[in-house]
């Protein structure tokens, strides 16, 4: 199995690619990590340091992978934290490119917005992009309760909701 994983990278803690890549590799998955940010820690701490990777840079990395034939045989694209709205566009472009080379590939989106305890961790334009464009393009989404409420415009309190 081959996965293109477009997510955050943090030095302190385990979220995004910092949490996903090693376990997937340990079970034999070929993971191509592309980072959306390179932060000291996740933004839920309220303060962090490090760069947001521009959408154009993410697209350049995907282009380099594509030029080497790396998008052929991809089984899934995973996406997570999107610190800027250009990142969402780059992810959607990457999904389209992967599907051009690997039509059966699925797109799994973790619509990282925040959580009930600490609220929203992303800018309003990112919230809208995720809800209006990224989630509809996904085959699978993995929202937490807070994110599900935002995406659906509801306030789910139980599993049934």
State the predicted function of each range.
Residues 1, 24, 145-149:
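Intrinsic structural disorder
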Residues 2-109, 113-117:
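Conserved N-terminal subdomain of the carbohydrate kinase-like
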Residues 120-161:
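Conserved phosphate/ATP/ADP-binding segment of small-molecule kinases
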